[in-house]
């Protein structure tokens, strides 16, 4: 946040929050921001309609609006523009359903894109992977970090997930240690 010139507002979550705990904490945080005069929240969602609707519904319930500047942009075009502009991003989490451990901790570049299986969105828009952007044209300075451990974590799947043959989700997380 400092490198981008924004204040950092933290929302502390319990180690493994329930959706209800998450909703309550998010509502409290957003209401606090609203009391400071903030009326909109910006999201990087691209094409998941249900997620966009969820975010809009949650914001509308407290009188705020969501802004989705990347909505419906072709992800192949978006990642090319992102890289061409000079943004630097590292993969911090991969969903083992789509990608193996070797993708955690990789920098997103042309080689990364070429190595992605065909069923994986290049922006990870279906939850295949998550990232941290540490440098680019909007940054005053790069965020300096070292790569820490790559850790496997499992989470139970909801009983409603009938399409799944496994009982749990498996994710690989790459710890980043800020210098």
What spans do the regions from the language model cover?
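Nucleotide-activated chemistry modules centered on ATP-dependent adenylation/adenylyltransferase
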Residues: 2-179
């Amino acid at each position: 946040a400092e490198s981008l010139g924004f204040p950092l507002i933290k929302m502390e979550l319990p180690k493994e929050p329930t959706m209800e705990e998450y909703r309550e904490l998010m509502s409290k945080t957003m209401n606090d921001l609203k009391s400071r005069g903030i009326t909109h929240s910006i999201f990087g969602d691209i094409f998941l309609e249900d997620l966009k609707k969820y975010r809009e519904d949650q914001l509308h319930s407290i009188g705020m609006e969501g802004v989705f500047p990347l909505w419906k942009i072709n992800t192949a075009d978006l990642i090319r523009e992102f890289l061409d502009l000079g943004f630097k991003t590292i993969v911090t989490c991969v969903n083992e359903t789509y990608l193996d451990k070797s993708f955690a901790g990789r920098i997103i570049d042309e080689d990364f894109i070429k190595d992605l299986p065909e069923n994986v969105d290049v922006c990870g828009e279906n939850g295949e992977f998550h990232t941290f952007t540490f440098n680019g044209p909007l940054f005053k300075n790069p965020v300096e970090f070292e790569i820490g451990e790559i850790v496997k974590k499992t989470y139970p799947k909801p009983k409603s997930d009938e399409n799944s043959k496994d009982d749990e989700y498996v994710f690989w997380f790459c710890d980043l240690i800020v210098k």
